[in-house]
């Protein structure tokens, strides 16, 4: 399980504080029809309002696919992870059935590629 390595830095470390901050940023908007969105992944104090504006308009879905860069160059350039993500709001589980379907010639499971990454931690 991946720990919240940037909790308390990129976003509040406690669930209560994080919920309060998210409630202040997320405002219900009319959903838009889309297949994807580009969302910033910096600390909430820098880009939280922009990310929240995008998330508020995304259609509801059972699974969201998060794609981020391999900042450090370790492991495969396009890698999947089986790890769950512990967050101040609870645990986010990966959709392993979808990940297995995506796994193949250019995408594969590689925890090394994810070990030092922090960008998805402010998105999950």
Task: Please state what every model-predicted region is.
Residues 1-122:
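Active-site histidine-anchored catalytic micro-motif
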């Amino acid at each position: 399980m991946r720990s919240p390595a940037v909790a308390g830095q990129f976003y509040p470390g406690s669930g209560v504080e994080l919920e309060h901050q998210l409630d202040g940023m997320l405002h219900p908007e009319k959903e838009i029809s889309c297949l994807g969105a580009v969302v910033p992944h910096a600390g909430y104090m820098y880009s939280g309002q922009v990310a929240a504006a995008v998330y508020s308009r995304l259609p509801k879905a059972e699974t969201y696919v998060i794609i981020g860069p391999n900042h450090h160059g370790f492991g495969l350039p396009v890698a999947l992870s089986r790890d769950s993500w512990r967050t101040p709001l609870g645990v986010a589980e990966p959709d392993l059935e979808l990940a297995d379907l995506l796994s193949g010639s250019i995408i594969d499971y590689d925890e090394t590629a994810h070990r030092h990454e922090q960008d998805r931690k402010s998105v999950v």
